[in-house]
Amino acid sequence: MSGVYLTVPQAPELINERIPSFTASCSEVAPEHSEMPLTVIYIVLPVVMESQLESTLDILWIPESYSTLMQENMGFPYHGRLQILAGARDSLYLGRDAVVLLCPSLPFPTFTKWLIQVILLLSYWGSGGFG
């Protein structure tokens, strides 16, 4: 299924309240790999881009060859040719508190480069890089 998957250790109701146009379907995934259960929330790409979630994200690109490793070691299902893991960093806890898995429906190289550039730009802007 194409789209963006956002994993957060929060109740989806909190995000739905913060982003009125946000709609989510969720289920718990791999609680044994984390100190707290993770909630998987499916959202479409425009909603992510319109939200403020990307302003605190840092990006890690994982190619398809790592899909088995991700499934076995981290418990995250793989949904396509590309995974982007992005999460706000906590100074006290170095783990990630959010994971975005992207399965693009547009041509891979151009769309991937564009998306990563947009997210990095928004991350830089959100951190006060242009101020």
Curated annotation (Swiss-Prot):
Compartmental location: Mitochondrion
Keywords: Mitochondrion
UniProt keyword annotation of Mitochondrion present: yes
Domain of life according to the entry: Eukaryota
Main location, first listed in the record: mitochondrion
GO CC aspect terms: mitochondrion
This protein's name: Uncharacterized mitochondrial protein AtMg00050
